[in-house]
Amino acid sequence: MLKYFISIITFLFVNITIGNVKTANDTLEKFGVRAGLDLNKIIRSATDEDYSGSSLSGDIRLKESFYVFTEIGNEEKVINSNYLNSSVEGTFVKFGVNFKLNKDIRTQNIVYSGLSAGYSNFDQNINSYTIYNTHSIYWGESIINSPINLSNLNAIWIEFMFGMKTEILNNLFLGFELQLKNVIKQKNIQNITNFYIPGFNRTYDSSGLGAGFSYTVSYLIPVVKK
């Protein structure tokens, strides 16, 4: 899997480098709406029986190096561990801005960084869990199979992104993005941890930090050419 990711990143860098050596006469600046799919979620849904998800994204280039974007999606995730079995399903939405970092403003290939805010509404079911009796050397642990249903949960977080998009065909782009996330607010019921937040990823008790990545395919619908 790591080798596959490295190959994708290398491919994108090579294409961006080639695109950046074009002269101003080789291409026109295109301003329009770019719509895309997260291929990572599609592949995970096909290969991981404990996961299902999809998302649609879109961005608009407002200035030479400034983009606004949004993403909407849904995820279902089953978490299995030695002490817990839980399932989560819900929807999410993100809004943010991206700033183009590469110097040649005319090339459609971009390296960018950005900042976004995310919101998710979801339900969580605790199907079974293990408790430990620290006061008894005879009973040790007990598995509880009484489900706990937690509905209408939500969370808000921020993301810092770094990524790249390269034009592989006319107006068709392949992209890769890394994300560093931090939960700033979330709703808990009965003081039970939200073990997975759709759109955010896995959570941990000790920190609100998280990480993620995506690789996307998108199509640019030009509105203005300069």
Kindly label every feature range from the protein language model.
Residues 45, 73, 77-88, 122-133, ...:
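Extracellular/periplasm-exposed beta-strand and loop segments of Gram-negative cell-envelope proteins
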Residues 33-37, 68-70, 93, 109-115, ...:
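Transmembrane beta-strands of outer-membrane beta-barrel proteins
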Residues 98, 207-226:
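Outer-membrane beta-barrel "beta-signal"
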